[in-house]
C-alpha cells in the first residue's frame, strides 16, 4: 500500500487507515474483483425506470472502469475504509441530477460517513433538489467531496461540498489549497498505475483528484470521528503541502480540465477490469 508515504503533519493522521469509515463511491459502479479494490461492504444501482421513476437494484458492477479507478485510489490511501458502491452512471458515464440526489439520500439512509462524487454538471436543471440532498447529508455530519474545475460545476460548487480539482503540480502525496475559490482543494490527477500499461493511457483528471481528497478525509474522520464538515475542511487546509495563488490557479490545473467526468473513455482500465474478472 502507498498510504504510509503520505506527507502529513499530524502524526495521528499518518497512522490512520480510515478504519471502518463508511465511504460511498457514487459513480459507474465498482469491480470488487479488481486487485486495487478488494472487499466491498455493499452497494446499489440507482436508475430511472421506464416510467421515469427512481429504481433500485443490487447490480452495481462496473462495466466502464471509472468507479473502479476511483475506488482503487481510496483503497490505496485509506486501506481500512468500508467501501460502498452507489452506481448511477450508465452509458457514456451519464445520469440525471435527480438520480444523483437519490444516491445521496440513499447514502444518508445507509449511515455513510463520506461520499465521493467524481462527477459534476454545469446544468442548472434539477439543481435545487441536488442542493437540498447535499445539505441534508451535511446536516447529518456526512462529508461530501466532488470533482470540480475553474468553471462552476455542481455539486462541487455548493458550500456544503468539498470541491477538488486535478493539479499537474501535485504528486501522489501532495494536496494544495486555493483560498477564495469555490473549488478549494487540489490533488494528484492520476489513479494507481496499471501493471503492464503506460500511465499515459490511463484515466486522469479532476475525478481522480476528488478520490485522493476523499481518502484523506476518511483518515481525518477516523482520527477525529466527531468532526463536522467545517472541522474536516480546516484539517485539510492544515495538511495541504502548498498554497495556490488564485490568480495563477488556471495555470496549474490539469490540462484535461476541459473534460468533465462524462467525457472520460477509460478503455484501458475497463479492459484490465474484464481481464481480472475472468482470471
Which residue ranges define each predicted feature?
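Active-site core segment of subtilase-fold serine proteases
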Residues: 1-77, 81, 170, 197
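C-terminal subdomain of the subtilisin-like protease fold in secreted/lumenal serine endopeptidases
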Residues: 1-2, 6, 112-116, 222-279
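Structured catalytic cores of enzymes that bind and process phosphorylated ligands/cofactors
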Residues: 6, 25, 68-72, 77, ...
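Catalytic-core regions built around general acid/base machinery
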Residues: 11-12, 125-144, 154
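Proline-centered loop/turn at the N-terminus of a beta-strand
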Residues: 22, 82, 141-143, 162
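Subtilisin-like peptidase catalytic core
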Residues: 56-122, 224, 236-244
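A cross-family glycoside hydrolase active-site/sugar-binding cleft signature
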Residues: 116-120, 147, 211
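Extracellular S/T/G-rich loop segment that most often corresponds to the catalytic His/Ser-adjacent loop
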Residues: 151-222, 226
